[in-house]
C-alpha cells in the first residue's frame, strides 16, 4: 500500500467518470439507489448552492442528523468547495449543540427535525429566535455571530430555513464553473472534517481532520478486508463518528465500492438489507451484532453473502466473535484508535485467530508508527511491559480547533500522539489495551467523559461532591455510575438526578447507577481514587442483588 494524495471530491469525480452507472449509495428500506454519476451530480448542485449562500473555503458547515441520504451529500459538497463539515452527535441536547455551534464558528447549519425524543426544530428556534423574524440569507444572530444560514434536510418548510430541495433546484440552474475553480484549489492536506471529542476538562474539543488523514485511513481499512468495486458495505453505525464517516465511507470511496445505508440501527432492517442487497461487509459495535444474532426472525434471512466487517467501539466477547463468524459468515476485524488518529492506529487482520481478534487490537496501520512508553519516564517499554499507547504518522489530526495548548498536550515535539490509553505489546506484535490513564468511559461505542457529567451534576444545589466512573457491563462495555455526597441537611433521590439529566444531556451520558455515599476514598495527597469507587459500586450492586446490564 502507498499513501494517496486525493481529495474527497476528486475521488468522487474519478469514480463518477470511471464507473458512472455503478451504485454508490443504496437505502434498501426506502428503495433509493444512487449511482456514482447521479450522486456526484447531486453533490455538485448542493455545492453550487452553498457557494451561493456565501460559503468560502475554510468555512464550517454543521450537520445534525441521523444517517439520512443527504448526510453524505453535504459531506462531499462541503469538501468540494473547501469547507469543513462539523459533525454533531444526534443525541446532543440544547447546551451541547449551543457550545459546538459557537466554538466551531459554524456558518451554515444543516439539520433534520429531530431524533428520538430530541426535537431539533424547537432547540434551534430557541437558540436562534432571529430565524423567525429575519429574511433567509440575511441572518444576523446575536448569540452566533458567524452563523448565516440554517438548512432543513428535507422538503418541509420552516421559517428562516432553506430546504435541501431548494438548494438542489438552485444548483441545477447555476453555472458550474465557479465550483470547478474553487475545487481546483482544494488540497489533500486541507481540513475537511471536524468532530468534537470531550476532554478531561469537560469542554469538548474540535478535532481537525484533513482529506489526507481520513482517506488514507479509509483506504488502509478497506485493504485489510480486501475491498473491491464488487463489495457492498452495510453501514448502520452513525456517520457523525469516525466509524461511519471514515472507516465506512472512506473505505468505500477509495475502492469504488457501494454503501448500503440504514438511517438508524434496527436489527430487522439490517438483516433485511443484507438479504435483499447481498451485502458482503457489515459494520457494528458488539451490541449491534448481538441484537442481530438474537433477533427472533434471524433465520428467515439469507446472510451468506457476508464475508467480512468491523466490530469495534468496545471490547468484543470471544463468544460473540465466534457466533458472528459461524452464523453470519462474517470474518470480522477490529480497529483501535481515537478521533485524533483519524481514527485508525491499530487493527486486527482477517487472518488472525478469533481469540486474537477478541482479546487484542491487532498491529499498527501501514505507515503508522506505534509505540508504548512509560508515562512517568517517557522511555520506550519492552514487549509485555505496560505503558501508554502512542503513535505517529499520516493519521495524526491537524490539531484541536482554536486550542493550541491542548494540541501541544497530546502531540509531543517528535510528532507522537499520546492516547491516554494503557497497553502492552505481545511477542507476536499485537497490542492489547489494559486500561486508561484518562478516565474516559466507553458505553456501546460512545465515548463519555466523566468530568462533563460531573460539571453538569454540580449544578444541583444539594450536591456537595460527585464523581462519575464506568462500571464493566457485559452488554455495553461500560455503564455510567455516579457517586454523590450531599450537603448537610439536603436530600436527593436517584429519580431526582435522572429527571434532572433527562432532556438536558445526551441519554447515553445519564448515570445508569447512582450511589449516595458520605465520603470518598482518597490518596494520601487528597486525590479521589476512582478505581476504588468502581470496586465499591460493584460491591454495593452485588449486595443489593442487582446485576449490571
For each feature predicted by the language model, list its residue ranges.
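AMP-dependent adenylate-forming
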Residues: 11-35, 157-158
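Structural core segment of the AMP-binding/adenylate-forming
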Residues: 52-53, 81-169, 490
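Gly/Ser/Thr-rich phosphate-binding loop
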Residues: 168-169, 276-284, 293-356, 369
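Conserved pre-ATP/AMP-binding loop-to-beta segment of ANL
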Residues: 20-23, 143-147, 151-158, 162-196, ...
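AMP-binding/adenylate-forming catalytic core of the ANL superfamily
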Residues: 92-102, 109-111, 282, 393, ...
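Conserved AMP-binding/adenylation subdomain of ANL enzymes
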Residues: 215-232, 240-281, 289-291, 295-297
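Conserved AMP-binding/adenylate-forming core of the ANL superfamily
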Residues: 2-4, 24-76, 93-98, 166-172, ...
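Conserved AMP-binding A3 loop
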Residues: 33-37, 183-185, 189-216
